[in-house]
Structure formats: structure tokens, C-alpha cells
């Protein structure tokens, strides 16, 4: 704990001389200037509307329509005006004009590549090299050895003989 404490002990480090900041600070008003006009008080401290305040004939709560009560949502202002947005708007205007419809049929060259693809989908937990077709044809085929067949499930600590893991070739 410090032996010396001052209420403004850290103020000196933020002094313009210490920060080597030679700009003259902007002068701000100490208090804001008063506004013209007044606010009309329409209710008392308990929230009851005062006498003499005109009330709505349709609703005792007034006819104020909030944002969520509006029938139509407020307009969205587009703050980002890009070239793509203006081109898109021009295309929409052009497409609004009547024109002949052209029947389009997909060409055989642009058919979906997923159907014709020879690569098989691999499971999620498999490594990328396990499911590749080139790797599968290059792998040598292992035949189970008689030693692997004679291993009991108890030695493998496997619950059933079907789940026993074969030894690598």
C-alpha cells in the first residue's frame, strides 16, 4: 500500500507537457446553453392526466402509434451505396419492361458434376487419404494370418470375436 496518496496524484502524467502534446485544447462551455421553449406538463406525480388537457375521443390512452404498432415498416435507408447496388437497380428496371421469354435448357456439359463424380464421399472422421480412390487401388490386400485367427478375444480385450482387431500385414 502506498504511504503517500493524493486525490490528483495521477493527473500530472496526463498533463500536456508530460505527454509531449503541444496542441492547445479546445475550449468547451462549462454549462450547456438553455433551450428556448418549454415542456408542457400533462400529468401529476402519480401519472394521472391533469384537468384541462385535451383527451382523445377514441381512446383514453391517446392515439400515439409506436414503431411496433405501425401497419407499414419504416423505410430502410441504404447507407452503403456501391457500384454493384446501382447496377443491380438498373437491371431490375430493365427487367421490369415487357420482353420475350427465352426458354433455357441446361446443356449436357453443364450438368451437375456431383452425379458424374467418381470420388466417393468419405465419412467425417476418416482421414483425407483413407477414402481416396487412388490410395485404395494402390493398397496391398492383406490376408489374415493363422496367428491372427488363433488370437482369442480375451487376449485382445475385445467383448466379441467380431470386434477383434486384425494385426497389420
Curated annotation (Swiss-Prot):
| Any one GO cellular component localisation term in the record | ciliary basal body
Q: Is Transferase a UniProt keyword of this protein?
A: no
Gene Ontology biological-process annotations: cilium organization
Which residues fall in a compositionally biased region of kind Polar residues?
A: 119-130
InterPro entries on file: Fltp
> Secretion signal: which residues?
none
Provide this UniProt record's keywords sorted from A to Z.
Cell membrane, Cell projection, Cilium biogenesis/degradation, Cytoplasm, Cytoskeleton, Membrane
The segments labelled Disordered in the record are 53-169
The places in or outside the cell where this protein is found are:
Cytoplasm, Cytoskeleton, Cilium basal body; Cell projection, Cilium; Apical cell membrane
State the protein's purpose: Acts as a regulator of cilium basal body docking and positioning in mono- and multiciliated cells.
- Please state which protein family the record places this protein in: Belongs to the Flattop family.
Indicate what this protein is called per its UniProt record. Protein Flattop homolog
Organism equals Nematostella vectensis
Amino acid at each position: 500500500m502506498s504511504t503517500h496518496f493524493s486525490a490528483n496524484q495521477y493527473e500530472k502524467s496526463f498533463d500536456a507537457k508530460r505527454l509531449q502534446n503541444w496542441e492547445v485544447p479546445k475550449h468547451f462551455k462549462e454549462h450547456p446553453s438553455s433551450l428556448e421553449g418549454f415542456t408542457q406538463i400533462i400529468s401529476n406525480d402519480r401519472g394521472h392526466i391533469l384537468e384541462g388537457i385535451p383527451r382523445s375521443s377514441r381512446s383514453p390512452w391517446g392515439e400515439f402509434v409506436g414503431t411496433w404498432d405501425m401497419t407499414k415498416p419504416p423505410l430502410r435507408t441504404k447507407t452503403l451505396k456501391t457500384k454493384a447496388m446501382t447496377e443491380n437497380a438498373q437491371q431490375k428496371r430493365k427487367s421490369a419492361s415487357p420482353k420475350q421469354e427465352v426458354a433455357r435448357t441446361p446443356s449436357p456439359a453443364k450438368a451437375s458434376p456431383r452425379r458424374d463424380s467418381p470420388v466417393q464421399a468419405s465419412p467425417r472422421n476418416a482421414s483425407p487419404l483413407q477414402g481416396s480412390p487412388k490410395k485404395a487401388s494402390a493398397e496391398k490386400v492383406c490376408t489374415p494370418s493363422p496367428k491372427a485367427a488363433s488370437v482369442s478375444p480375451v487376449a485382445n480385450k475385445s467383448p466379441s470375436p467380431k470386434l477383434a482387431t486384425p494385426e497389420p500385414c
